[in-house]
Amino acid sequence: MTGLMAGAVMSIAASNAPVMAQEITVITPYLAQPGTQMFIEGFKAEATNMGWTPNVIDTAGDIAAVISRIEDAVTKQVDAIVINVDPAQIEAGLAVAKEAGIPVIGMDSGTSPLLVSNITSNGYAMAAETSVYVANRIEGKGKVVMFVFDAFPPVQIRGVVADAIFGNFPDIEVIDRVTPDVSDGGIADSRAKMEAILAANPEAGSIAAVWAAWDQPALGALQAIEDAGRGGEGIVIVGIDANPQARDAIAAGGNFEASVAQDFVGIGKMTAGVVARAIKGETIKESVIYVPTVLITSANVGQ
């Protein structure tokens, strides 16, 4: 009996022990984005606690290079790979990892049969909150500018939801659906594109709102509006992510009124937890795992 009890204790201890992985590779083309930086921060913190050696690779906007980096990781026989990119664009690399038996986990990436799971925020819900906020603030009428990025699934779905909501208000007109250059983060090009839109709509009050699928374009639009001296027109700006710059802008009480706080660090930590489960050989039933979010306005930005 004593031997059985000792064996049981050892079994429980083993199941709760850290997963000692030789190496985990994290690959992203979007490290210039503040949100991605926080994903990585959370992942690395949890990975270190588990005794892993996380290797973070930034391809600096080069999607094709992600495939090569996955192949390199497979050659090195890493224990797991984490991606932060549209899996549909890198299927060749994912197939190589699958063939090698190396689990690949998405960190705010998008879903794919070649992934164990994707850990992210609920983009549908976030877009619904911010687009409904805009519709209510402008009382269901006026011209709206949208900033989208359909090349990346977690952001693409936000635009789809906003399209549907604005389309349900007969007196709301989406006058432009802008896809900014995100190679430098997205603020500069969003600002330039918003400047052009303002120039094409010079009448005061001609633009009611700017809806952005993430904060960087919203911040760029804010700069353009303020520089044009049109901040007093009451143009409502919303974003998604609630990064520090966005929070500061919301707290300032100007045109940038709302964003959604994603738990970026929490997504990173949750991703590490799913990696641990995958390495142990556990079957992950959920193709998508959502981490909760919070709408941020002037009412709660200081909390």
PLM regions with names:
Residues 4-18:
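C-terminal segment of classical bacterial N-terminal signal peptides
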Residues 17-303:
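A residue-level marker of the well-folded mature domains of exported/periplasmic proteins
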